Amino acid sequence: MASIALWANKNGCDKLNFTYKTYSAEDTIALGREIGRRLHGGEVIAYRGGLGAGKTTITRGISEGMGLGDEVTSPTFALVNEYRKKDCPISLIHFDMYRITSGQDLETTGFFDYMDDDAVLAVEWSENIDEDLPEDCIKITINRLSDDEREIVIETCDGDVRFENIGN
């Protein structure tokens, strides 16, 4: 079941929040799959959530929904993983910003170069690069409620309702 809240931030950008609850990793992947089906390229997804919250799990579902398959792994040590497929017009670039502490560190990941691409950028530990994220990025916060349960909040900007009623 989803709950929806509308509010305006200090910059005047209307934000929409869509809240979902998942009860297993499979549910989280299924939610990600539905998110992936609604992406068209050029989006930046900014994840928030602690270790083991499910950021890579939901990214696996997003990749499936985009038609890129489920071979998604955490980019913790590589910092960035690219998922491309010859017959898929959109690619997925998956970042882990856990160890990024400066603009110089961020520059070495190629983040800004990828933003010029029509790819979807999925950014774990996005709070480490808040000031460099586009204002219209899609924010996904994953709250771990138990070993299996997650509360997942999707925040969009300027009336973007693509993620309303997922799974209903």
Where are these regions (language model features)?
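Phosphate-binding P-loop
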Residues: 37-41
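Hydrophobic anchor at the beta1->P-loop junction of P-loop NTPases
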Residues: 45-47
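Conserved lysine of the Walker
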Residues: 55
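Short phosphate-coordinating micro-motif centered on Lys-Gly-acidic
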Residues: 13-18, 64, 104-106, 112-168
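Short beta-strand-centered segment that lines the nucleotide-binding/catalytic pocket of NTP-utilizing
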Residues: 68-83
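Walker A (P-loop) phosphate-binding loop of P-loop NTPases
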Residues: 52
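N-terminal pre-Walker A segment at the start of P-loop NTPase domains
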Residues: 14-31
